[in-house]
Regions:
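An acidic- and aromatic-residue-enriched active-site/binding cleft used to recognize and process polar
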Residues: 2-7, 78, 138-140, 174-175, ...
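Short conserved micro-motifs at the rims of enzyme active sites and ligand-binding pockets
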Residues: 13-15, 36, 84-86, 92, ...
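H/E-rich (His + Asp/Glu) clusters that bind or coordinate divalent metals
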Residues: 150-154, 160-289
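Short, basic, glycine/proline-bearing loop/turn elements
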Residues: 39-48, 192-199
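Divalent metal-dependent hydrolysis catalytic cores, especially in the metallo-beta-lactamase
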Residues: 1-11, 19-32, 71-78
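Short, surface-exposed amphipathic charged segments that create phosphate/polyanion-binding patches used
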Residues: 16-20, 40-42, 208-212, 289
Length: 289
């Protein structure tokens, strides 16, 4: 699952990076990744027009990643801006692109409009290519993370739009603190959640309450995930994956035992739900064994 945010920010990002120390850390990484994507299509700078950027850079990058086995594209955009994506026309975005391509310090309002268009374009292309869209959706690292900006309800207009009904959106990390809002959004046919990171930092007893709330209504929309990442010398990916996996299984046991005790489900149904969360739901979504 490659990161794709870099293609949403094709211009000079120094103004955005100056907003706070968190973004000062992230944007140079995005710029480096974008340079590698440009190099892969034998370019050093973005094309002169939006049409050129889409047809020479964005779509070929997505198609190449899909052909190499990617089942989804990941956005960490929550670290870079909020989920308040407007719906500009291609013509509006093209004018902004032409106005600022190759120039320093693009107007922030103009640049946001272009980002909004590019995010939607990439999401639609992912649907065409049968790749899911992964969105970081949990209060994240750093002290400047905008919690209000990642309210998943901000994305509801996109989830409802006919253009994106073929795009499967996976809200990563369970959406904390918006666990109830995200649970309600699971009624959308194109919205899922996974348990990565949340399973690492939230104790099983607390996680079990949220799991039960989701599983009682949308058991086929909840996906096992660990966020097995090398966080530090003391917490490598191995430890992170083990701890998160253990926590999920403990939380799942608590949630399903409670549902059994309250006669909401049978033992066979509990086993089926557990298999779904731990394997089958993700296998069906991503088309993997």
């Amino acid at each position: 699952v490659p990161y794709i945010d870099a293609l949403v920010f094709p211009f000079d990002n120094s103004g955005l990076a100056a907003a706070n120390p968190d973004r000062a850390l992230f944007f140079p990484l995005e710029d480096k990744l974008r340079a590698s994507y440009l190099a892969a299509v034998k370019l050093q700078t973005p094309p002169a027009t939006l049409d050129g950027y889409l047809t020479q850079v964005v779509t070929p990058t997505l198609e190449r990643q899909h052909s190499e086995g990617a089942v989804a594209e990941k956005f960490e955009i929550a670290y870079l801006r909020g989920f308040d994506f407007s719906d500009p026309s291609r013509e509006e975005a093209a004018k902004v692109y032409a106005r600022w391509v190759g120039k320093a310090h693009p107007d922030l309002a103009d640049y946001k409009l272009l980002q909004d268009f590019l995010f939607r374009y990439i999401a639609a292309e992912c649907g065409r290519l049968h790749m899911a869209v992964h969105l970081h959706g949990m209060s994240g690292a750093g002290s400047y993370f905008s919690i209000a900006g990642v309210n998943p309800l901000l994305l509801e207009p996109m989830f409802n739009a006919k253009r994106f009904r073929q795009t499967q959106f996976v809200m990563l990390h369970g959406g904390w603190p918006y666990v109830h809002e995200l649970g309600a959004l699971l009624q959308k046919p194109n919205v899922y959640l996974d348990l990565s990171q949340q399973s690492l930092v939230i104790p099983p007893r607390t996680l079990a309450g949220w799991l039960r709330e989701w599983l009682e209504v949308f058991p086929d929309k909840v996906l096992f995930a660990t966020d097995g990442y090398p966080f530090s010398d003391a917490l490598g990916w191995e430890e992170a994956a083990y701890l998160a996996s253990r926590n999920i299984r403990d939380a799942l046991g608590i949630a399903l035992s409670g549902m059994l005790r309250d006669r909401e489900i049978t033992r066979d149904r509990a086993a089926a739900i557990a298999r779904g969360v731990l394997h089958d739901n993700a296998a069906k979504l991503y088309g993997i064994p």
